[in-house]
Amino acid sequence: MLLLELPIKCRMCGRFLRQLLAQESQHSTPVGRFLLPMLMGFRLLILVSSGPGVFGNDENEFICHLGQPGCKTICYDVFRPLSPLRFWAFQVILMAVPSAIYVAFTLYHVIGYWEVPGKENKEQETQISKGDHSKDVSGAKSLKLLWAYVAHLGVRLALEGAALGVQYNLYGFKMSSTFICREDPCIGSTTCFQSHPSEKTIFLNIMFGISGACFLFIFLELALLGLGRFWRIYKHKLSFLKKLPTSESSVRSKDTTDELSVVEAKEPF
């Protein structure tokens, strides 16, 4: 019996996954369906493969002239309050949170409205007995997913913009090779040096470029969704206006026919 039930369960799981993927990408354009996931994957790949080699040993390679105990540690803390690797790792996790919430909402939506074989006819009969229309119900479901998708894009856009601003305030566009430190317990001022500033500048600008491209693509996705929504509303109104004169003319012709029949009936023979 278990062997006989296994293919049925596999088909049901496959149907459920297909419906989940279809609902998740129902309202997205090719920008949100392909370009944004590719950029997120590319950012994660660059960060994991090259980040530790560039910034992994940054504190040990930070050198100061004075050998005063604790001077190097304090100067490095002032020079770099937050490690770039930790900042970018936190950024990747933070950007994934809105997408995870949207996928969870879609999963809840699919589980709540997923129709098991044999259940569809019962739901249709219930809707007909209550006077509901299936198109209205499906339209309401689709509208909820659309607004959830737009909201998650808006949150991602705000987070990307905030991350760009924080990254610029922390690191700028160039990693300097020297740093003048005047903090205690250093005696007077000391000059400190960081290793491979050119390599770190290139990596920093690459991460800036990826974040900027993500910001632009999210904004483009929102713009395309707005234009598509406006175009559908415009087409609906246009088709309604095209149908309106024909309906009015048919009503007028019907009224004219009724008036003629009344006049003919009143005329004496």
Curated annotation (Swiss-Prot):
Q: Which residues lie on this side of the membrane: Cytoplasmic?
A: 55-86, 167-205
Alphabetically list the UniProt keywords: Cell junction, Cell membrane, Gap junction, Membrane, Phosphoprotein, Transmembrane, Transmembrane helix
Please indicate the ranges of residues that lie on the Extracellular side. 1-33, 108-145, 227-269
* GO cellular component terms listed in the entry, alphabetical order: connexin complex; gap junction; myelin sheath
- InterPro entries from the entry? Connexin (IPR000500), Connexin_CCC (IPR019570), Connexin_CS (IPR017990), Connexin_N (IPR013092), Connexin_N_sf (IPR038359)
GO biological process: one example: cell-cell signaling
Tissues where this protein is expressed: CNS specific. Expression is restricted to brain, spinal cord, and sciatic nerve.
Decide whether keyword Ribonucleoprotein is in the record.
Answer: no
One Pfam family cited in the UniProt record for this chain = Connexin
Record's bilayer topology term:
Multi-pass membrane protein
Any stretches that span the bilayer, and where are they?
34-54, 87-107, 146-166, 206-226
List residues modified as Phosphoserine: S261
| Entries under PROSITE patterns matching the protein | CONNEXINS_1, CONNEXINS_2
Q: Where in the cell is it found?
A: Cell membrane; Cell junction, Gap junction
For molecular function, the Gene Ontology terms on record are: gap junction channel activity; identical protein binding
Q: Which family does it belong to?
A: Belongs to the connexin family. Gamma-type subfamily.
Outline the subunit composition.
Answer: A connexon is composed of a hexamer of connexins.
What is the stated purpose of this protein?
One gap junction consists of a cluster of closely packed pairs of transmembrane channels, the connexons, through which materials of low MW diffuse from one cell to a neighboring cell.
Q: What's the protein called, per UniProt?
A: Gap junction gamma-3 protein
Give the gene that encodes this protein.
Gjc3
